[in-house]
């Protein structure tokens, strides 16, 4: 199975490392320095278990090119930042929507899993905006510095659409 992960921060990178134990993973990020570190087997975040896994070797290739990352993927995990804007009292979900537009153009048959922090009901709205895409939501419950461990030993599992 081919999996693409958009966003290689704590959430995306821990997912990519975990999934790469059994699958080929292509990570996508807009920051070249993060991509370069991943491709060199180094972590752009502080997490000992992720650092160790990358140093030992994984089946992760990273790119800043969405075409390269999303083409042929069976699944696309979206873990892009959605910073909270206190002035608007809302999360900035533009990065999630940008990835969805890219996947819709490049690989509309992929199943998409949104891991980014989004408002309640947000994914339901996406299904009307992107009716041809199969979109699921699986919230993350990770602690910085323990992201891989928390993915391996979750306190709870929630998935919805």
Question: Where are the regions that the model predicts?
Answer:
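Conserved hydrophobic helix-helix packing surfaces used for dimerization/oligomerization
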Residues: 3-5, 112, 157
